């Protein structure tokens, strides 16, 4: 392949190539083995019924299982600052962290972003992740989502917060000849994390390993949710019992993706919520060991 003239290399392309080189060199230096222990947490939507009944008791139970961090989802924005401080104290007392939160699209609006920012800072979060965007019929619609993420990234940067995007299955399905997830990746700042939901990626027929390798340094968080093609099971399969090739995913994430933390997510199973969370963590540790 002929070398690309520097004059035609965009800033975004240059940064992407630089990130690829960095992670390639890191992989060589480590002998293609993980160079550090990546924490594993729980997306608290997995225990949503328990969380609604007893937020602090549920977080305590999750920490006792051995989870190292938690990801709060949209209802956290209903908290007062005092409630957020109480939760942060609990996290500190338990020795666990909140590295990210899941947010509705309007949390990034002018009317809500300040409160979301302040609560995330109290919790110690690094990333405000856009958890869902309604399917768009045109690429222009998805480009506007990318613009929203870029704008939020600029507003949150002074507070030390970054932005992320969490995929569902719809982003892998072509619109006007291109996958929306590619539009988001190519039109957002390199600082915008691409949080990979493995289960929805698999459901859409996409390859999570290929996606990680195509976006070096940007897959800083992964939702470790499995998926079964059995329509009676789907996302309710336990971690490790579905279609995902977790060893290949972990290797790609740690040698190419720049993963900083894993999050187990479960949308239900044949067991109660807390038992499901415990079983998934045990399976994760066995697979990732």
What are these regions (language model features)?
Residues 1-3:
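Short, Lys/Arg-enriched N-terminal segments with co-localized hydrophobic residues
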Residues 18-20, 24, 32, 69, ...:
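Active-site acidic/histidine proton-transfer and metal-coordination neighborhood
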Residues 45-47, 73-77, 103-106, 132-135, ...:
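Active-site beta-loop-alpha junctions enriched in small/polar residues
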Residues 71-88:
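Glycine-rich, proline-tolerant flexible connector loops at the mouths of alpha/beta enzymes
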